[in-house]
């Protein structure tokens, strides 16, 4: 007897998702590219062109003809998946399947899998219900978080400090990794496009589900837009109301760090000029020409220092009043090399733990303590 097909609630927890061997999104590649459950694979039962053709038949001829043509294509595509991606799956393989509404596309694959003998599950309501669950999570989970913002001028290695803290066991939320962007004018990653807004939100939802209630979570100060990605309103509100630890560093240390951290741009200076053109409304033609001259001469230390002092630092100062009102302490860097970053991470972890337990702590930590 074929095993029954199980219907799964769209608000399935991350822990329950891990109980399945494979999460299969049977929607078209274009639908999958816009958003999907993180970790899912795309085994479409109709590709983009086929889906469009069946939709046209449905509207211009009649639903019966469309369903018959669609069923033939779905059967062919599922057969192709069984002969390729799924050919080595064992008897006890447990897939979780979803389509747009949890109807015909996922149902067709689940029925065939069940007839084979696989215990298949389908997300009730499909992606549409899953998306509502994500939006609900992004609305209410941030209100339960205990965030600690790590702020500081551009070039103070905040992202590296957070990742060093994570390696030491501190819980963090790395928005720049999720957004595939460093959150500044020169923050785009060459050859690595940003995710769609929806997929960013799906990833963030999973991260938030892993946050333990009452646990202090470190997160880098960001604007409400990271590249093309918008930080969800409730999460942004939680960030704006969270206490802050500020990182300071000498200008020369910041310049040296940025030259190392943005080596991909130093090696490809042609990538920088189109980005600088976005500053025409903020800086004079004379200043832009001076920056271009530094780039042409590959005078990276002077270029970086000038960009910091003329553009980034004034922008940071303009946002200072609200940030200072929430500031709970300062950690002072010296060199921003590997060892210094690790010491800063430990100092921030100590300060954050002290604040969380309401213990008195010094207002400043030196990175070499």
State the predicted function of each range.
Residues 237-244, 248-369:
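Conserved NTP phosphate-binding and transfer environment spanning the P-loop NTPase/kinase superfamily
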Residues 167-238:
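Conserved nucleotide-sensing/catalytic segment adjacent to the nucleotide-binding pocket
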Residues 72-124:
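Catalytic cysteine-centered active loop of the rhodanese-like fold, especially the PTP/DSP P-loop
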Residues 1-38, 66, 135-142, 147-151, ...:
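Flexible, polar/low-complexity N-terminal or interdomain linker segments that lie immediately upstream
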Residues 104-105, 146-166:
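Glycine-rich phosphate-binding P-loop
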Residues 17-90:
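Positively charged, proline/Ser/Thr-rich regional signature most characteristic
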Residues 110-113, 159-171:
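A conserved segment at the C-terminal end of the G1
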Residues 118-132, 174-179:
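A short glycine-rich beta-strand->turn/loop micro-motif centered on a GG-aromatic cluster
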């Amino acid at each position: 007897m074929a095993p029954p097909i199980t219907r799964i609630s769209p608000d399935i927890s991350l822990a329950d998702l891990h109980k399945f061997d494979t999460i299969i999104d049977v929607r078209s590649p274009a639908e999958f590219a816009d958003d999907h459950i993180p970790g899912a694979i795309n085994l479409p039962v109709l590709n983009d062109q086929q889906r469009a053709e069946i939709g046209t038949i449905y509207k211009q001829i009649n639903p019966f003809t469309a369903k018959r043509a669609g069923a033939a294509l779905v059967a062919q595509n599922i057969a192709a998946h069984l002969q390729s991606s799924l050919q080595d799956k064992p008897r006890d393989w447990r897939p979780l399947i979803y389509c747009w509404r949890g109807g015909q596309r996922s149902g067709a694959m689940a029925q065939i899998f069940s007839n084979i003998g696989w215990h298949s599950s389908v997300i009730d309501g499909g992606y549409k219900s899953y998306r509502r669950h994500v939006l609900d999570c992004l609305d209410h989970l941030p209100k339960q978080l205990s965030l600690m913002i790590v702020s500081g001028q551009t070039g103070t290695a905040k992202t590296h400090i957070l990742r060093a803290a994570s390696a030491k066991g501190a819980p963090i939320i790395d928005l720049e990794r999720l957004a595939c962007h460093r959150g500044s004018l020169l923050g785009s990653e060459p050859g690595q496009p940003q995710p769609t807004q929806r997929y960013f939100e799906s990833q963030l939802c999973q991260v938030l589900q892993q946050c333990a209630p009452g646990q202090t979570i470190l997160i880098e100060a960001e604007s409400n837009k990271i590249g093309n990605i918008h930080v969800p309103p409730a999460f942004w509100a939680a960030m704006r109301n969270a206490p802050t630890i500020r990182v300071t560093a000498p200008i020369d240390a910041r310049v040296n760090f940025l030259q190392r951290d943005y080596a991909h741009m130093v090696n490809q200076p042609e990538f920088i000029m189109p980005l600088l053109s976005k500053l025409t409304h903020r800086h004079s033609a004379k200043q832009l020409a001076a920056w271009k001259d530094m780039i042409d001469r590959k005078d990276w230390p002077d270029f970086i220092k000038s960009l910091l002092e003329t553009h980034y630092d004034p922008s940071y100062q303009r946002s200072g009043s609200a940030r200072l009102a929430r500031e709970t302490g300062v950690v002072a860097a010296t060199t921003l090399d590997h060892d210094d970053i690790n010491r800063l991470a430990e100092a921030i972890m100590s300060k954050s733990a002290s604040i969380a337990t309401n213990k008195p702590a010094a207002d400043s930590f030196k990175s070499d303590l």
